[in-house]
Structure formats: C-alpha cells, structure tokens
Amino acid sequence: MKTPAIELDERLDTIPGTTISLIQKIDGTAFSIDTLLLADFVSFTPEMMNSADLGSGSGILAFLLKYRNKNLQITGFELQNEFFELSERNLKLNSQYEGVYFENMDVRDIPARILPESYDLVVSNPPYFPAGSGRLPEKTTRAQARHELNGTVKE
C-alpha cells in the first residue's frame, strides 16, 4: 500500500483488530472509544443491505460496520467539508471496502432527497451537548462535532 500524504495536523492510525487505516486530525477531533463501542453494539440481520451513517466525520463508523458485514452498502452523510474531504481520502486509503460511499450534505436535507425506506439501518454518533451548553471549543470543526450547532438529535 502506498503511504498517503499526511498533513502536519494529521496522523495515520491503524484500527486494532481490523484492516482499517485512518487519517485523523490530531487537534481533538479524532474518533473515540464511543465509536468503537457503537460499531460493536450494532446487530445485523441477514436482510440488512443498506445503511446510513449520519454525521460520518472521518468515516470510521462506516468502515467498522463494513468490516463487520461485507455485504452492507453504507453511505456516510457529513455536513462539514473538512471531514467530508477527510472521509474521501480515507475511502481511497481503504479501497478494499467496496460499497462505502460519502455525501457532503446536511442530514436534515435527507428526507427531501432520499426515501426513508432506502435504508435498513441508520446509525449516528451525534454531538454530546445541546447548543448553548458547556464550553464551546475554539476550533469550529470540533465545536460542531461536540455541540448541536447544526441541528438537534431530534431533527
């Protein structure tokens, strides 16, 4: 495998126990144990073929689910351009995972563009804090990942 270009604010990680390599930001917007636990928590049924990952970030959850279920088609939806571009780079890095796709869009726009029955499984590792609560990180990407600045879980 050719080593990808890594920016100064990034690192290349290998996810233990998998064949997944992932470029991540080193400024605190990297995935956490919560994402690994969520991926392990998901139960698959034989009829599950299409999945959506809402707020897919770097793509880690989509790759973990695909690693666990080779037949699953997964589309990650990510609003933040920086993370969408990172997920696309990670997709090139993990080209062995056919059937993983990413779209740069607001998850609140999905109902207007995609039929709800298009997906058998929908997953998300949403922001932890409601807007206006807690201390807001200075970096915009980190703030949006941790706080409901672009919509609520209910939306």
Regions found by a protein language model. Give the residues of each.
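Conserved SAM-binding loop of SAM-dependent methyltransferases across substrates and taxa
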Residues: 58-71
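S-adenosyl-L-methionine
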Residues: 88-114
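A short acidic, Gly/Pro-enriched loop at the edge of an enzyme's catalytic core
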Residues: 113-121
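Conserved SAM-binding motif I beta-strand of class I
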Residues: 73-78
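Short alpha-helix immediately C-terminal to the canonical SAM-binding loop
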Residues: 84-85
